[in-house]
């Protein structure tokens, strides 16, 4: 059985997604991902591409909210750390 989503985790995911989705169109582009990650420190274009490849499971060039949720569920610790920053 899958682990239930904690209400705080859900709120954190929504807040983080909105932070990355700078133009508010409901999806995260590689540009938005890179620009937001730059606020956390140096990130290379190769690192952004790798992250896009990992999270963008349908390969349309954007991270949808559902793709982000699936990534967040698989990486709960990482998302909690990111939530502390944002």
UniProtKB/Swiss-Prot annotation:
EF-hand domain segment(s): 8-42, 43-78
Residues annotated for Ca(2+) 1 binding in this entry: 21, 23, 25, 27, 32
GO molecular function per UniProt: calcium ion binding
Highest taxon above the source species: Eukaryota
Binding residues for Ca(2+) 2: 56, 58, 60, 67
Keyword Ligase set for record: no
InterPro entries: EF-hand-dom_pair, EF_Hand_1_Ca_BS, EF_hand_dom, EF_hand_pair_protein_CML-like
Keyword entries, A-Z: Allergen, Calcium, Metal-binding, Repeat
CDD domains per UniProt: EFh
Protein name: Polcalcin Nic t 2
Species in which this protein is naturally found: Nicotiana tabacum
Gene: Nict2
């Amino acid at each position: 059985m899958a682990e239930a989503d904690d209400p705080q985790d859900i709120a954190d995911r929504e807040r983080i997604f909105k932070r990355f989705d700078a133009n508010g169109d409901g999806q995260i582009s590689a540009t938005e991902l890179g620009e937001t990650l730059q606020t956390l420190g140096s990130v290379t274009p190769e690192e952004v591409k790798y992250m896009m490849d990992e999270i963008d499971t349908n390969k349309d060039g954007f991270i949808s909210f559902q793709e982000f949720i699936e990534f967040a569920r698989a990486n709960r610790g990482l998302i909690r750390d990111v939530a502390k920053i944002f």
